[in-house]
From Swiss-Prot:
One of its GO terms (molecular function) is 5'-nucleotidase activity. One of its GO terms (biological process) is dUMP catabolic process. This is 5'(3')-deoxyribonucleotidase, mitochondrial. The lineage of its organism: Eukaryota, Metazoa, Chordata, Craniata, Vertebrata. Its EC number is 3.1.3.-. The active site is at D33 (nucleophile), D35 (proton donor). Dephosphorylates specifically the 5' and 2'(3')-phosphates of uracil and thymine deoxyribonucleotides, and so protects mitochondrial DNA replication from excess dTTP. Has only marginal activity towards dIMP and dGMP. Residues 1-23 form a transit peptide. It holds the Pfam family NT5C. The keyword tRNA-binding does not apply. It is found in: Mitochondrion. Belongs to the 5'(3')-deoxyribonucleotidase family.
């Protein structure tokens, strides 16, 4: 995420298919964000915030607005922004996040599709003592060691070339003003209220028809 601000990859026993996919000019490249798309950043943050600061006010998930958790907490009460940040800067925060429902299964299926290259594209926080390592450990835990080759760590996703980026952040900007990918907004508690203007599209959850979104790019 939020917040900070994400594999798939070659399944065991299928290295030849993956190599052919990468070599094919028809391969569809999909970037999948991690926090808020694969891992439940919002739920994990709220649980740990309330456990550490039980007497302080908090923002319920249904009241979340805006991508940046720390900004909304800062408006709630002076000093809460720093306390919020301390949660995700703590050891084991990223590693202990639970997968979002259906995320692991969907991305594994996606990685097995013919002519499809899938990468987790995630932005580590600037306080890097724990975050980068824990992101790799999380992927290994939930996807297996082969998926580690499919991780892209970057603070600027606009410079990564792909056909699709599935990400819960509504506004993704960076050095490249015209990224190669189409941004599919993954619905989260902080963005569900936003009205997207066509041709922008959403993926409401991993139970939604993500295959249709991929197929729509193949037809172009």
């Amino acid at each position: 995420m939020h917040r900070l601000r994400g594999c798939c990859a070659r399944p065991r026993g299928a290295p030849l298919r993956a190599e052919r996919s990468r070599a094919s000019s028809r391969a569809l490249r999909v970037l999948v964000d991690m926090d808020g798309v694969l891992a439940d950043f919002e739920g994990g943050f709220l649980r740990k915030f309330r456990a550490r600061f039980p007497d302080l006010p908090f923002v319920a998930l249904e009241d979340r607005r805006g991508f940046w958790v720390s900004e909304q907490y800062g408006r709630l009460q002076p000093g809460l922004s720093e306390k919020a940040i301390s949660i995700w800067e703590s050891k084991d925060f990223f590693f202990e996040l639970e997968p979002l429902p259906g995320a692991v299964e969907a991305v594994k299926q996606m990685a097995n599709l013919q002519n499809t290259d899938v990468f987790i594209c995630t932005s580590p926080i600037k306080m890097f003592k724990y975050c980068p390592y824990e992101k790799y450990a999380w992927v290994e835990k939930h996807f297996g060691p082969d998926f580690l080759e499919q991780i892209v760590l970057t603070r600027d996703k606009t410079v990564i070339s792909a056909d699709l980026l599935i990400d819960d952040r509504p506004d993704i900007t960076g050095a490249e003003p015209h990224p190669s990918w189409e941004h599919i907004l993954f619905t989260s508690c902080h963005n569900y209220h936003l009205q997207l203007q066509p041709p922008r599209r959403r993926l409401h959850s991993w139970a939604d028809d993500w295959k249709a979104i991929l197929d729509s790019k193949r037809l172009r």
